[in-house]
Amino acid sequence: MKKKNTMRKLLRYLKKYWLLLILSLLFAALTVAMTLYLPILIGQAVDLIVAPGQVEFSTIARLLLKMGILIGATALSQWIMNACNNRITYRTVRDIRSDAFARLEILPLRYIDAHSYGEIVSRMIADVDQFADGLLMGFTQFFTGVLTIVGTLLFMLWMNPLITLVVVVITPVSLFVASFIARKTYAMFKEQSAARGEQTGIIDEMVGNQKVVQAFGYQDRAQGRFDEVNERLRKCSLRAIFFSSITNPSTRFVNSLVYAGVCVAGALSAVHGGISVGQLTSFLSYANQYTKPFNEISGVVTELQNALACADRIFELIEETPQTPEPADAKTLTDPDGSVALEDVSFSYVPEQHLIEHFDLAAKPGQRIAIVGPTGCGKTTIINLLMRFYDVDSGCIRVGGEDIRQLTRGSLRTSYGMVLQDTWLKTGTIRENIVMGKPDATDEEIIAAAKASHAHGFIRRLPQGYNTPITEDGGGLSQGQKQLLCITRVMLCLPPMLILDEATSSIDTRTEIKIQEAFNRLMQGRTSFIVAHRLSTIREADVILVMKDGHIIEQGNHRTLLEKNGFYAELYRSQFDI
């Protein structure tokens, strides 16, 4: 049932290319027709050669010329058919991969957080490639195989129904074997695909975090974990390949029986004058052409099981429930005044395990709101909710008096300038990374933003300055420099609201002071949310919210909270040893 559903989903993609499909089928039929006509010419030539009397070489020459033209035309027709099949396959693969990527872009972060990056990448790259190989083989060999079987059967019935009966009686054994193995291998290939995805995930983790792996001496344990998955993949692959490898020898054995039966029956018929030597030659050629597609189709069926198993995993991604759609009348947030309110907000990552309960917060335009507290208290979660990376379970969040669920996500998020604890840089130049939020920025604006964030100095010292290429992880740059680039992005856009999540945690104290000066200028008149463990970065905040277990337990500015001598004062003293 699941395979049928997968096939129906696939057919929806193929329908767009119905014209190419018809063209492919027409040239497949033409290729088969010309291929099947060739044995008749060969049989006629054999009869001319073995006939009593003088051999008519002129007639044989004409037959040979016909054969040459026919072979050339068959090759051309097959080339056009393959070209059509290639176009159908790779356009379909392009569409599926585009849909998978488009769905990935609108999936809730809950899905991304629940799956390893490598596993998602494996579905979109390795699984799609495997699917493409199976689909191409299916188009290339399945059409011609079926047409060849039908065509040769008709020709053999026309030539000698009795000998054809021998072929038809023995052949179903081959179909039974192929069908049995196909049912067995589908589940095995799906298991193999899943193990391959898990292995890709481990490699992605290890390559991306190799410094941490080596720093903690995790190499042996990482190797053990990889070997365990690698061994599981080997076993899955062996089981799948073992069963699939039985197909070809089994069908070849049955086909040999067919060929032997035709030889015996044909020889007996020729002895009694029921068939000429040339006709027997043609019949043997047809018998060979009739059985050959069964070998190919059995291989195609096995490959298709792998392709369908991979397609099933791809369609699982494409059909994942997307994030809550925006209402049809969603408003675009333009020129917000900076007021933000969280009203009776409750949220949980895991159902019935509340992280934040009945949370209230009111930020006035231009206020600097600092959020502090121990790890896991919900600080970063508040930021996720403000940006609507996650939706609240109950309550609501308002920006400028508007419920953010009634706003377009794009307009909401571009209203915030965000610097995260984990820096992210894309493959490209320094300049391309800075202008991500403002692609039309001038060189003067870029340099001004870099100077304001104190990034201009180190950028100028790079080999090609702002045109220096970097990799996605910012290879060659220090963690502090990478974070400075991320801060420069925000400096360039000058959004009405700011979110700074551990924004200076990777920068030395001297640079941090300069950054704080730049941020003070940037935050002037802008509502700012600052999440930090380093309390030195939030002394100038208008309001400091002290969180614990998803609740605000203290609230005030730096001085009043110290005077209260509560949890904040305890945190402050622990950091500054006073």
Where are these regions (language model features)?
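ABC-type nucleotide-binding domain
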Residues: K2, E326, L333-I578
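Juxtamembrane loop-to-helix connectors within ABC transporter transmembrane domains
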Residues: N5, L14, V46, M81, ...
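Alpha-helical segments in transporter systems
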Residues: L11, L19-I40, L63, M67, ...
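Transmembrane helix-loop-helix hairpins at lipid-water interfaces of multipass membrane proteins
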Residues: L21-I80, W158-L162, G273-V277
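A hydrophobic transmembrane-helix motif
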Residues: G43, A73-L76, F139-A182, R234-T281
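Short intracellular "coupling" helices and adjacent cytoplasmic loop segments at the cytosolic face
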Residues: Y90, S98-S122, A126-V128, G201-R225, ...
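An intracellular "coupling" helix at the cytosolic face of ABC transporter transmembrane type-1 domains
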Residues: L109-R110, A126-L135, F139, F143, ...
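Cytosolic ends of transmembrane helices, especially the final helix of ABC transmembrane type-1 domains
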Residues: Y218, F242, Y259, Q289-L317
